Amino acid sequence: MLDLKKFLATPNDFEVLVKCLKKRDINRQHLIFIQKKWETSRQLKKKIEQLRKTRNQLEGPQNAEKVRVVKSEIATLEKELNGLNQELDNLVKELPNLPAPDTPFENRIVAKTEYTPLFQPQLTHEKILRKLVLIDEEKSILLSGSKFIVYQDLGSQLLHTLINFMRSENSRRGYRLFDLPYLVNDYNLYHTGQLPKFKEDSYQLNNHNFYLIPTAEVSLVNLYQKQILSEKDLPLNLCAYSPCFRAEAGAAGQENKGLIRLHQFHKVELVKIVEPENSYSELEKLVQDARNLLHLLKISHRVVELGEKELGFSATKTFDIEVWLPVSQRWLEISSCSNCEDFQSRRAQIRVKKREGDKYLPHTLNGSALAIDRLILTLCEYYYNQKENRLEIPEVLKKYFF
């Protein structure tokens, strides 16, 4: 959530807000509408305070009728103010985070690493998945419909091997491991920015206030909601595996087949809660932690800094990591690493207490390390031995393979 007081206090501050949110397709007139609501709210508060002072100055039975009139006026204005503040709160909830000042207009490649596949690639991952019977798409449809997947035999082994590999490597790099609920209350999704804007993309239980998580980021950030943390405990580095659930329609055609775009998918997520002055150096570390896994697996990849209009709702800066599929001849996003600054901590009421006693909002960061279903199809194009019709297990995974 944005701090409106910071941006509506002066005309210059308001122009900064207009300029930044124009990059996120929020028009000036909408912000002027919000500004007028905020100013009306501010004036109502002043009027109520003045009436309270007047009431306190009226003493004695001779002023009883005047006190009654003032109390009635205060009650009327307070009701008006509460309704206005609720309307204002709903409007502010819809505003996305501001892009970092150095965010590019369009996506730009900032790093790239190339590796040679173990075997000369010939078959696409779709053909390899079916040839090795790693998944059963027909049974997936029988169970749940399209965009769900059944892993079986080697496919199931590979899924859990990658989960254990990623958890182990991330733990080795200083992340605390968590296993968390996959159902959360609606306010948890609000804290991280999925609600109210992306309600239609979420799975909600009928007649309940529970939602299936779209990412473990939701659960990890909300472990610290409404808490005051000690500055000496920062940075917090958190890691969790979870299945993720998203109802979004996605792209049409080939994207809806196989493992690329699913309603239920698997991901290991990293979250950092850090001091504001360190958040961008921590973002660099987060990107390196995600890339570390791809280096170990010897998979070609690149890092793309997202342009202004590509940023997620809560993010102020994002780097996507894309893997190269040598047979499919395409780049595929496998991780997205974002700095949300204090957008989520303000919503979740996460604060940090300094040694001298002052409190501040920490910055939150999140990133996938990595998207597992997409990594499985990537491994197919790098490690499939067509001559012997088998998938070679990368050396770094063998100690996790069972």
Language model features: what each stretch is:
Residues 1-116:
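N-terminal alpha-helical targeting/anchoring segments
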Residues 23, 27, 42-43, 114-402:
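TRNA-recognition modules of translation machinery and tRNA-sensing kinases, especially anticodon-binding
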